[in-house]
Amino acid sequence: MQPFEEAQQLVPGLAPKPDLVCLSHLRWDFVYQRPQHLMSRFARDRRVFFFEEPIFEDGPARLDVGERPGGVRVAVPRLPHGLPHGEVEAAQRDLLQGMLAGHGVSDYVLWYYTPMALGFSADLAPAAVVYDCMDELSLFRGAPPALLERERRLLEVADLVFTGGQSLYEAKRERHPSVHAFPSSIDAEHFGRARRPCPEPADQAAIPRPRLGYFGVIDERIDLDLLAAAAGARPDWQWVMIGPVVKIDPETLPRRSNLHYLGMKAYDELPSYLAGWDAALMPFARNESTRFISPTKTPEYLAGGRPVVSTPIRDVVRPYGELALVEIAEDPEAFVAAAERSMRRLGEGAPEREAWLAQVDEFLARGSWSRTFRHMSDLIDGAVLRRRGGPDATN
């Protein structure tokens, strides 16, 4: 039984909420991040369908729909190799409409993570349209040329625009009448496990200390030159990099005996790795692709009780750097110095650690994923009511 069905049984007469159909450029089974946190919570009180970008393979077009833990139904379009470009969106449209009909989805909120999905969904009739802009996708490597025009059209039809950070909010707020900033939130209980003794993962156990680690996607947003220089400056420190390598050639990764690439790990495994680090890293490059990012790992590292060092990414400097929760450093020399300083001041047993952790916890308490979900859900309820012409107290 679905979580929302259980809720309806517990509260007889509870009006069902519209289903939620999410159109995403990210894979559900890839890195666990904002879409998974939010959609798994929405699935507690409504049906959620997560429609991914297509996979091209041999055979006729089909849609694989499977349920994930928590109740989200993940739909993966599989399209034939060699399908002409002009027919790809038509095939996606057919598969999406077939899914809606086959699952009896008639009253639903349409939630976009990518404006490109407008090409096969513009003729639908949702109860409300949400654009959750978690990144400035047009600045990423390989962005489709049509993306900016699609975003312009999406902003015209959306009822609500959510942004993944303050910088994105400032970039979008003049382009739509209802833009709301929802920066990276946190499951503090999950990552708080790193503050307690954890069994060492087998592939990290033999790596000496001190360990400085990163988890997340390794792509054009990582400053590989900074990483190489910092690792070279401190050969006695071990630099642990966890996550998939995408959009860059793995051969371009710096290689040293104290640099360890451990690959992608499941979300449930991350606290165990984090617990074995002496500091956590965000060695982001300063380029167009990082201009608007609001890294989810910032609060995750902090919830795990690790001192954090980051390059001056705007949404990290403000608020984390300004509140002295995170050390900010721009070049390799400053990065190494900041890491050394933060480990000395804030590491296990350090004199300032307890006061810093208290400040961290006070800050993180205001930004849980559950709190973000509730606020978003209230805004969506209001948008649905407005479309239906009913009373709305949610402004």
Stretches with model-predicted labels:
Residues Q97, P144-V161:
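Membrane-proximal helix-turn-helix segments that form the acceptor-binding/catalytic region
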Residues A324-E333, E340-E348:
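Conserved acidic donor-binding segment of nucleotide-sugar-dependent glycosyltransferases
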Residues I248-L274:
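Nucleotide-activated donor-binding/catalytic signature segment of Leloir-type glycosyltransferases, i.e.
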Residues G347-I380:
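A charged, aromatic-enriched C-terminal amphipathic alpha-helix characteristic of glycosyltransferases
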Residues D29-Q33, I222, D268-Y273, A280-A303, ...:
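Nucleotide-sugar-dependent
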Residues S167, S185-A194:
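Carbohydrate-associated surface elements
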Residues M1-G59, A231-R234:
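N-terminal subdomain of nucleotide-sugar transferases
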Residues D203-I222, L227-A231, V240, A365:
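Conserved donor-binding/catalytic core segment of Leloir-type glycosyltransferases
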